[in-house]
Amino acid sequence: MSWSPSLPTQTCGAWEMKERLGTGGFGNVIRWHNQETGEQIAIKQCRQELSPRNRERWCLEIQIMRRLNHPNVVAARDVPEGMQSLAPNDLPLLAMEYCQGGDLRKYLNQFENCCGLREGAILTLLSDIASALRYLHENRIIHRDLKPENIVLQQGEQRLIHKIIDLGYAKELDQGSLCTSFVGTLQYLAPELLEQQKYTVTVDYWSFGTLAFECITGFRPFLPNWQPVQWHSKVRQKSEMDIVVSEDLNGAVKFSSSLPHPNNLNSVLAQRLEKWLQLMLMWHPRQRGTDPVYGPNGCFKALDDILNLKLLHVLNMVTGTLHTYPVTEDESLQSLKARIRQDTGILEEDQELLQEAGLALIPDKPAAQCLSDGKLNEGRTLDMDLVFLFDNSRVTYESQVSPQPQPESVSCILQEPKRNLPFFQLRKVWGQVWHSIQALKEDCSRLQQGQRAAMMNLLRNNSCLSKMKNSMASMSQQLKAKLDFFKTSIQIDLEKYREQTEFGITSDKLLLAWREMEQAVELCGRENEVKHLVERMMALQTDIVDLQRSPMGRKQGGTLDDLEEQARELYRRLREKPRDQRTDGDSQEMVRLLLQAIQGFEKKVRVIYTQLSKTVVCKQKALELLPKVEEVVSLMSEDEKMVVRLQEKRQKELWNLLKIACSKVRGPVSGSPDSMNASRLSHPCQLMSQPCTAPDSLPEAAEKSEDLVAEAHTLCTQLENALQDTMKEQDQSLRSLDWSWLQSEEEEQQSLERAS
């Protein structure tokens, strides 16, 4: 639909006339704006010179529009009151919803769509137009004039919505379902309409297939620059499976059943849509649209199967090859890995599948765990669902990536850059060169995404390693504090034991146990292992920081962006040349840009893979350190338990010793303070074995008894004082040690209790 400048201001109540939106088969379409409500509508009015037959068609279009109700067919609106009086004739006006996105032709003519729409945009277009055509056919209506100018775009809440307009040539099916009259646009017409043969709904299949092909490739499938008579005689020679009839740069006509390159489809969609186009572009109408599975008119169901595919894109970082896999909702990740092994030769156990953020796919979840709804992002590239494949059996990566093969016409001008070409060929091949440079930039960007995914995964592993290092260091300090306390306690015990052995308690068994404890704790601590691991982790940390500081560790633009912009500008200037200046020309400047882009791509890929190899080496070191740190942490945990057990054992032995000493104090005693000692207390039988001498007299015996009682009281007091001094000394010794580690453990325990 062509756009024109604003028309002279004209009003009808609150409605104000704006610009002409386009010119249809019967008249003009003008936008009107309601100044009070902000509502906009499109008013279609007929030209005065319509023939009776076309006046009849016009009234039929209004009747059809008013009874249709489908989201992909433009809706009729009520003509505002009083506006009919402004019509240039007595024919009724047609009011329709206004779609601010313009028509599909305007969209296709944008520079970036010179080699076809983006994959997501193609899928949403096919879905919308198929839904609209199916609705029309179910209502026994053939459109007969489906083309980009008759499809308008409306921005919905989540994506663009495509709507069919201009049913001026639509035909309701009669009882025989055959029609013989037509006046329409020739380039999208089915052959039987050109031949003025009887036709059915399959004429819309041909138009839809032609439209779909143009949206995929950027040009119409069958000799788009030929006149109708020559076109018909040549194209009818194609086989039923041929979907392309084109001229090469030498003027030779070629037939092909394959979807041409370049386009923006992945390999799976390209293959499936190629077969679907073969159904839609069959020359003979009775066979057209017949699907091998769904039968006659089964093309819509076949298209549904394609549109409902869930596709996972896997970039093999070893070779740079992009693989696409249809996956089901319940397909396991292991099943996907088996398919990947068939395509890449990488064993399942060596495959690592990372998302862009560096997260690995979860083994217990289905293969489709990372897929999103691509239909909601019709303007974006397919990288949003990209998964990066790494081979864990490799310790280094070498660049095995080469630029994609060039289209035939681009290869031709690479060999002959000075060759003059007609303007229409020059325009097409320059667009393909620009697309090739774009493809190099996107391929490079995907590889860089893969390298960054590996880097993000390394940082995740390093973060885990850092947490374990901190935990290991903290545990090492706590263990050291416990060991120091235990060793100090043992040393004090042994020292005090030696001080009192001559006149005090002697126990070889107790002494041996303490010696064994002292030797046992000498093997605890793991200080050397911890120190060695910390040194290795610090060295790894330095390597990772160096990687992050590297220019390739961050997203960059650079040469390819500049070359792509220069190619775009050359192509833009060529397309915008006035018609009288569209002469033959060569492609030297474009070829120079393409060759520079190829060189820049190869150089950048080498840098990416150098960075990737360093990343993989660091990751390997991190993965080697993780189990070693876990092992040391586990050993320190066992050491800590051992120290606690030994400490408990020592404490029990000390208290048992005190218990024995106290029990002896309460037994029979004799002698004087000078002769009484712990050795005697430990052998009470010695007290009983001393000979008794009879007192000389009763008063003397009574006096001696009083002396013994006094002496016993004195000894008890001395023993109590000695025990108190010993306990006080031990308490001071305990207080002098660092007990902060126990406080931290107690706080952790309290926090856990509050959390539970």
UniProtKB/Swiss-Prot annotation:
InterPro entries: IKBKB_SDD, IKBKB_SDD_sf, IKK, IKKbetaNEMObind, Kinase-like_dom_sf, Prot_kinase_dom, Ser/Thr_kinase_AS, Ubiquitin-like_domsf. Its EC number is 2.7.11.10, 2.7.11.1. The modification Phosphoserine is found at residues 177, 181, 670, 672, 675, 682, 689, 697, 705, 733, 740. It catalyses: L-seryl-[I-kappa-B protein] + ATP = O-phospho-L-seryl-[I-kappa-B protein] + ADP + H(+); L-seryl-[protein] + ATP = O-phospho-L-seryl-[protein] + ADP + H(+); L-threonyl-[protein] + ATP = O-phospho-L-threonyl-[protein] + ADP + H(+). The modification S-nitrosocysteine is found at residue 179. ATP binds at residues 21-29, 44. Residues 737-742 are annotated as: NEMO-binding. It comes from the Eukaryota. The active site is at residue 145. It is found in: Cytoplasm; Nucleus; Membrane raft. It is an enzyme of class 2 (transferase). There is a cross-link at residue 163 (Glycyl lysine isopeptide (Lys-Gly) (interchain with G-Cter in ubiquitin)). GO terms for cellular component: cytoplasm; IkappaB kinase complex; membrane raft; nucleus. One of its GO terms (biological process) is cellular response to tumor necrosis factor. Serine kinase that plays an essential role in the NF-kappa-B signaling pathway which is activated by multiple stimuli such as inflammatory cytokines, bacterial or viral products, DNA damages or other cellular stresses. Acts as a part of the canonical IKK complex in the conventional pathway of NF-kappa-B activation. Phosphorylates inhibitors of NF-kappa-B on 2 critical serine residues. These modifications allow polyubiquitination of the inhibitors and subsequent degradation by the proteasome. Component of the I-kappa-B-kinase (IKK) core complex consisting of CHUK, IKBKB and IKBKG; probably four alpha/CHUK-beta/IKBKB dimers are associated with four gamma/IKBKG subunits. The IKK core complex seems to associate with regulatory or adapter proteins to form a IKK-signalosome holo-complex. The IKK complex associates with TERF2IP/RAP1, leading to promote IKK-mediated phosphorylation of RELA/p65. Part of a complex composed of NCOA2, NCOA3, CHUK/IKKA, IKBKB, IKBKG and CREBBP. Part of a 70-90 kDa complex at least consisting of CHUK/IKKA, IKBKB, NFKBIA, RELA, ELP1 and MAP3K14. Belongs to the protein kinase superfamily. Ser/Thr protein kinase family. I-kappa-B kinase subfamily. This is Inhibitor of nuclear factor kappa-B kinase subunit beta. It comes from Bos taurus (Bovine).
